[in-house]
């Protein structure tokens, strides 16, 4: 009995501990010779250096091919990752993978679904989507506190307007089904802007209480709204299509768009988005 009297308060204290989480989403641009001076072998060290400097607890990448995943694994030894290639659920095609600090977190379970009418079928696509798209997720436990939470990472179609709308509807359904009442983060390259129809589904409080970290942040470290630049430091088209959305459980402590560059080019054609959360 004395043991129980000591243990129960400790369990109660652990369950009330606050988790502080630094998350980042980054479309790193696939490895293709067509990019010339911006090819992956030339810029991979810059991408890894940016990530080392920002030190996110968890970050999601989009467009990563298997060789790029291997490069990041080698260049960022403090991280482990979960993800699958979208074409075969193995190593073929682009990943929407999640990297996490293995000294701070452990993965309880993970999964991937396809943004289609048959989300359990690898390689499937539907609606007016040009190519196969996925959402990968992990259920994390913070080792220090024992608190757990979900992170979802996705990349929407770049051409199909209906596909983007239907993908947002599907993700809402899947998150409710998978995460239940647990805290969660949804991030990625959504290929829609705040004025587009799918964005309105994010703030539909009657369905799920999710906030855009750009607007919810207590401290906004940038007023820039551009996340796609096509590698260009100057003269880029300005589009905000990369987001970090947080469930109602989360305080958004800060928001930033990382504009690190060499004076001519950014390390990728997208800029990484960073948010600090607590729950």
Residue ranges of predicted features:
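Metal-dependent phosphoester/phosphodiester hydrolase catalytic core
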Residues: 130-132, 141-165, 169, 178
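Active-site neighborhood of phospho(di)ester-bond hydrolases with catalytic His/Asp-centered motifs
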Residues: 60-62, 83-84, 185-189, 212-215
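Metal-dependent phosphoester-hydrolase catalytic domains
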Residues: 104, 162, 173-184, 192-279
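N-terminal, active-site-proximal structural segment of metallo-dependent hydrolase catalytic domains
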Residues: 13-75, 87-94, 169, 279
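Active-site metal-binding loops of divalent metal-dependent hydrolases
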Residues: 28, 63, 154-156, 189-190, ...
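Bacterial Sec-dependent signal peptides at the C-terminal "C-region" and cleavage site
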Residues: 1-19
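Structured beta-strand-rich core segments of catalytic domains in phosphoester-bond hydrolases
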Residues: 58-148, 254-257
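Short, solvent-exposed loop/turn elements at domain surfaces
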Residues: 30-37, 108, 161, 220-224
């Amino acid at each position: 009995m004395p043991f129980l009297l000591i243990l129960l308060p400790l369990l109660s204290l652990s369950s009330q501990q606050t988790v502080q989480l630094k998350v980042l989403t980054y479309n790193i641009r696939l490895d293709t010779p067509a990019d010339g001076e911006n090819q992956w072998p030339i810029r991979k060290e810059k991408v890894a250096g940016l990530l080392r400097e920002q030190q996110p607890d968890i970050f999601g990448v989009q467009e990563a091919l298997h060789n790029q995943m291997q490069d990041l694994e080698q260049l960022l030894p403090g991280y482990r990752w979960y993800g699958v290639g979208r074409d075969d659920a193995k190593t073929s095609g682009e990943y929407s993978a999640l990297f996490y600090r293995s000294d701070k977190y452990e993965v309880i379970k993970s999964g991937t679904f396809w943004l289609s009418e048959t989300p359990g079928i690898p390689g499937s696509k539907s609606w007016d989507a040009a190519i196969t798209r996925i959402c990968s997720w992990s259920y994390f436990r913070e080792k220090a506190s024992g608190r757990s939470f979900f992170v979802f990472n996705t990349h929407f179609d770049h051409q199909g307007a209906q596909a983007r709308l239907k993908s947002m509807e599907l993700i809402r359904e899947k998150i409710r089904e998978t995460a239940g009442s647990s805290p969660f983060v949804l991030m990625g390259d959504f290929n829609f802007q705040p004025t587009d129809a799918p964005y309105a589904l994010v703030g539909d409080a009657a369905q799920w209480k999710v906030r855009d970290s750009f607007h919810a942040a207590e401290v906004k470290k940038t007023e820039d709204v551009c996340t796609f630049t096509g590698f260009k430091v100057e003269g880029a088209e300005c589009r905000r299509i990369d987001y970090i959305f947080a469930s109602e459980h989360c305080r958004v402590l800060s928001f930033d768009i990382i504009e690190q560059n060499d004076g001519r080019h950014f390390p990728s054609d997208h800029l990484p988005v960073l948010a600090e959360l607590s729950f």
